């Protein structure tokens, strides 16, 4: 009887460790493209909230951004896994991640001509064979301000996305009208978690 119990415990431990090992091997890496435009701690909070939620769901997220200030870098390095892009998004390679995701915030507001299409619409990954998502994109204003040229380029880039969502009800109608895509309305990432203060 004791021998059978020892064998049972040994089998249980082997199965348990195999399951843990398999889960580690199958954990999906997500490259999360983040908007960073100067001294904005709000961006860091959104990035941290998304990182926390993705970890909770069993993913292996990496926060990817440009134009970070040193205090933002310190915050993100302390609480997340982050990657700072120095020159341009071509530093990211197709096989590095299983998924790419545009994080929430005003990612569809044209702050930067240099990075607008890469941050908001993953232009650098246009021809990649990878799942691409937009979570909780914001236009940053109530009236549509993108040019016809921006609409054409963005609409073409969004064709290759697996999922598109926005965080403003008004953006649902604007995106439907101008891009011909019906996005899902979602919460801001900071509202997805319960934090103990």
Regions found by a protein language model. Name each.
Residues 2-11:
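N-terminal Sec-pathway targeting helices
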Residues 11-156, 190:
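Aromatic- and Gly/Pro-rich donor/ligand-binding loops
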Residues 46, 172-173, 194:
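Short, well-ordered alpha-helical microsegments
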Residues 68, 168-172:
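Short, polar loop motifs at secondary-structure junctions
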Residues 128, 160, 179-182:
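Short, structured coil segments at secondary-structure junctions
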Residues 161-168:
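A short beta-strand/loop micro-motif in the catalytic core of glycosyltransferases
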Residues 172-190:
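Helix-loop-beta element that forms the nucleotide-linked donor phosphate-binding surface
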Residues 189-191, 195-197:
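Hydrophobic alpha-helical positions that pack around
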């Amino acid at each position: 009887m004791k021998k059978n119990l020892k064998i049972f415990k040994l089998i249980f431990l082997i199965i348990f460790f195999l399951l843990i090992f398999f889960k580690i091997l199958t954990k999906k890496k997500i490259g999360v493209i983040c908007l960073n435009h100067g001294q904005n701690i709000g961006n860091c909070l959104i990035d941290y909230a998304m990182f926390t939620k993705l970890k909770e769901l069993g993913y292996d997220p990496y926060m990817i951004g440009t134009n970070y200030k040193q205090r933002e870098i310190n915050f993100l390095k302390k609480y997340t896994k982050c990657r700072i892009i120095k020159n341009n998004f071509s530093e990211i390679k197709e096989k590095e991640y299983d998924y790419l995701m545009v994080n929430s915030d005003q990612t569809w507001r044209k702050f930067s001509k240099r990075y607008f299409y890469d941050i908001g619409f993953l232009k650098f990954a246009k021809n990649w064979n990878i799942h691409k998502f937009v979570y909780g994109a914001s236009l940053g204003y109530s009236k549509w301000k993108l040019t016809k040229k921006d609409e054409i380029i963005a609409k073409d880039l969004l064709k290759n996305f697996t999922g598109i969502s926005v965080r403003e009800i008004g953006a649902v109608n604007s995106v439907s009208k101008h891009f011909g895509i019906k996005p899902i309305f979602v919460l801001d990432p900071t509202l997805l978690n319960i934090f103990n203060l």
